[in-house]
Amino acid sequence: MMKKIYKKNQLLEVNNIPSEVIESIRETIGVLNENYGENRDIEADLGGYVLIAENIVDIEILKQDKLQGLIPEYTDIIECSEGVNWTSSLFLLSSDFAIVVVTTEELSKFLLE
């Protein structure tokens, strides 16, 4: 199941994800909060959020819904000491609203195809 993260304290509820990925998400949330406000209405205000996609079903739902027809502005590889690398892909839905999809490197191949 996808996890939508837009506040740093939500990271306390995230399990089974490498610490390097958590830190990357924390940095992204920090930038969004600094520029758009920590208490923004995530659905109505500008800014955006991070989505953690944990399986192929999550990826397919994203591609058919919010990310339909979009290609990422960029994708960064998050190198993890535990062996499985993750990626962070920035999708701009408008000039002031972004979704950053964080997923394993293997699943990102489906996200980017």
What is each stretch, according to the model?
Residues M1-I22, T103-E106:
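Short, extreme N-terminal segment that most often corresponds to the first beta-strand
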Residues Y36-L107:
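Acidic, low-complexity, intrinsically disordered interaction modules
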Residues V21-I29:
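Membrane-topology and secretion signals of cell-surface/extracellular proteins
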Residues L111-E113:
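Short acidic DE-rich linear segments
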